[in-house]
């Protein structure tokens, strides 16, 4: 230790000697070069890998030199808070929660036991649109959302215009409605048909009814019907399929019966639009606009505020990536951005009136959300293949320039998100597409800022240089020499070996062509 201190104390005197300075430089260069060699050899990386193997994993990983795999998770706790939501506990108990912080909810139960005495009930037929709200007793008259929810559920479950059984409403019990599912007909075939219709309506209402009533069948014998082009299948050895006799709706308090799912809210809202829209698709006049919270143009892109994402902060997405939402409508991320932007800007003039918000969103969600994407993901969920729940999205980010791809939905399988290795081909393709897009954009930018005449001049000058370089390497003969004679310059000999000035006056001497003197 004393030698080291003495070395640093005598450092000024040492530097005074030129030889010592040279030795110090050589030592520093050797040490730095040795460290670089050790790093390039991979020895340090091997030790780091052995120490951290199985103990540490990074949530982000590099793709090549500059591209990084990243993700974002949307937070829906404050989104669509003015709309009811639904969830399912099992195949018999389902719940609808009121909007915001309200305490009321509606319990939907499938059972084989009746809870209403028909002699003390008021019959309300399904064909009458508004009579279902007469079943709501002792409920705050100002709470129109419950009546809206009841009407939506009623129209979705009991399709108007068909021969369906009446419903029973219990008096003096707040909300208690009973659907008799066995009164449609005595024949089992028609009851099964009605049961399938009911399940279809419930699945559209609840959204997440993947395996609540349906499972799989080991055999399905199908054959064409006589005098018809229809195919009839007889399923056997089926598991998990059952029917119930009664459907009960009753009011309840919300006690976190099950986990909230924002997709169920979207399904619920879109189920009511189905009563007025025959087909649902994105309208041609709707385009994605890049704007900030005040509605002004936002050339830099679109930013999700702190309330819209899981982690605290603001996440911005570039104009180049977000603008792709105008090119096609096959991105779940674009649909979520439209919903967030609509929720933040379009309803400010409604003075936070939940019913007005709900009515407006119900009428416009048809143009905000792609029903084709919802249907595709619902079919994927039913078929037990990875599907999108519109919550977590991944994208490729270029750490050098900040450019990134349009976020893609992180698919779910068996209740959990897929591992990154399961869709490796997809994010590698996105990375290559980002490289291609950046190179193309850089090429177009350079082409736009460079005059075409300058490009032509550069091309022809380069061609001229290559040609002259070839001529320089080959060389051309410049004058004649007399064999075995000195250079006759500045005289210029003819093929006979003479010069007109008379200096070389004897003709007939042999001559040869030579190149210019170097």
Swiss-Prot record:
GO MF, one annotated term: metal ion binding
InterPro entries assigned to the protein according to its UniProt record, in alphabetical order: Arena_glycoprot (IPR001535), Arena_glycoprot_zinc-bd (IPR043015)
Site (Cleavage): 58-59, 283-284
Binding-site list for Zn(2+) 1: 57, 491, 499, 501
Chain segments annotated as transmembrane: 18-33, 457-477
Residues on Extracellular side: 2-17, 59-456
Residues that hold Zn(2+) 2 according to the record: 479, 481, 487
Listed GO biological process terms: fusion of virus membrane with host endosome membrane; receptor-mediated endocytosis of virus by host cell; virion attachment to host cell
Pfam family name, one: Arena_glycoprot
Cellular component GO terms held in the UniProt record: host cell endoplasmic reticulum membrane; host cell Golgi membrane; host cell plasma membrane; membrane; viral envelope; virion membrane
Ranges facing Cytoplasmic side: 34-58, 478-518
Lipid modification (N-myristoyl glycine), residues: 2
Positions annotated as glycosylated: 90, 112, 127, 180, 251, 389, 397, 414, 419
Positions of disulphide bridges: 87-258, 303-316, 325-334, 388-409
Site (Important for GP-C-mediated membrane fusion): 33
Domain of life: Viruses
Keywords: Disulfide bond, Fusion of virus membrane with host endosomal membrane, Fusion of virus membrane with host membrane, Glycoprotein, Host cell membrane, Host endoplasmic reticulum, Host Golgi apparatus, Host membrane, Host-virus interaction, Lipoprotein, Membrane, Metal-binding, Myristate, Transmembrane, Transmembrane helix, Viral attachment to host cell, Viral envelope protein, Viral penetration into host cytoplasm, Virion, Virus endocytosis by host, Virus entry into host cell, Zinc
Similarity-based family: Belongs to the arenaviridae GPC protein family.
Listed name of the protein: Pre-glycoprotein polyprotein GP complex
Organism: Oliveros mammarenavirus (isolate Mouse/Argentina/RIID 3229/1990)
High-level lineage: Viruses, Riboviria, Orthornavirae, Negarnaviricota, Polyploviricotina
């Amino acid at each position: 230790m004393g030698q080291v201190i003495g070395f640093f104390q005598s450092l000024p005197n040492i530097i005074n000697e030129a030889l010592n300075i040279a030795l110090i430089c050589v030592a520093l260069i050797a040490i730095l070069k040795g460290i670089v060699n050790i790093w390039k050899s991979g020895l340090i990386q091997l030790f780091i890998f052995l120490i951290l193997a199985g103990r540490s994993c990074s949530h982000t990983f590099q793709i090549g030199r500059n591209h990084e795999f990243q993700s974002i998770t949307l937070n829906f706790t404050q989104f669509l808070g003015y709309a009811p939501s639904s969830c399912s506990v099992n195949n018999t108990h389902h719940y609808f929660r009121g909007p915001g912080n309200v305490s009321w909810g509606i319990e939907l139960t499938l059972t084989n036991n009746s809870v209403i005495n028909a002699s003390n009930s008021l019959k309300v037929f399904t064909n009458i649109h508004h009579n279902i709200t007469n079943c709501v007793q002792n409920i705050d008259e100002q709470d129109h959302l419950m009546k809206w929810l009841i009407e939506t559920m009623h129209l979705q479950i009991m399709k108007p215009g068909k021969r369906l059984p009446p419903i029973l409403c219990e008096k003096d019990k707040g909300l208690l409605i009973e659907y008799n599912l066995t009164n449609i007909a005595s024949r089992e075939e028609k009851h099964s048909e009605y049961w399938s219709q009911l399940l279809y309506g419930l699945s559209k209402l609840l959204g997440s009814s993947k395996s609540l009533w349906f499972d799989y069948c080991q055999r399905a014998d199908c054959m064409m019907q006589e005098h018809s082009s229809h195919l009839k299948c007889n399923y056997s050895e089926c598991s998990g399929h059952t029917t119930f006799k009664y459907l009960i709706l009753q009011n309840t308090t919300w006690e976190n019966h099950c986990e909230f799912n924002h997709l169920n809210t979207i399904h619920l809202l879109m189920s009511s639009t189905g009563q007025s829209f025959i087909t649902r698709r994105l309208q041609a006049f709707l385009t994605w606009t890049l704007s900030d919270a005040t509605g002004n143009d936002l050339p830099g892109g679109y930013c999700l505020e702190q309330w819209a994402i899981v982690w605290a902060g603001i996440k911005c997405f570039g104009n180049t990536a977000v603008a792709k939402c105008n090119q096609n409508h096959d991105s779940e991320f674009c649909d979520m951005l439209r919903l967030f932007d609509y929720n933040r800007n379009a309803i400010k003039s409604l003075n936070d009136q939940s019913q007005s918000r709900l009515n407006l969103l119900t009428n416009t969600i048809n143009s905000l959300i792609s029903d084709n994407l919802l249907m595709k993901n619902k079919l994927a969920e039913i078929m037990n293949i990875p599907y999108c729940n519109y919550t977590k999205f991944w994208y490729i980010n270029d750490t050098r320039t900040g450019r990134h791809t349009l976020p893609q939905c992180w698919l779910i399988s068996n209740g959990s998100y897929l591992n990154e290795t399961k869709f490796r081909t997809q994010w590698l393709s996105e990375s290559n597409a980002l490289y291609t897009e950046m190179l193309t954009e850089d090429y177009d930018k350079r082409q736009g800022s460079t005059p075409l005449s300058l490009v032509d001049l550069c091309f022809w000058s380069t061609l001229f240089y290559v040609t002259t370089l070839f001529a320089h390497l080959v060389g051309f003969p410049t004058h004649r020499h007399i064999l075995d004679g000195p250079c006759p310059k500045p005289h210029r000999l003819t093929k006979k070996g003479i010069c007109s000035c008379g200096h070389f006056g004897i003709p007939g001497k042999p001559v040869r062509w030579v190149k210019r003197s170097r």
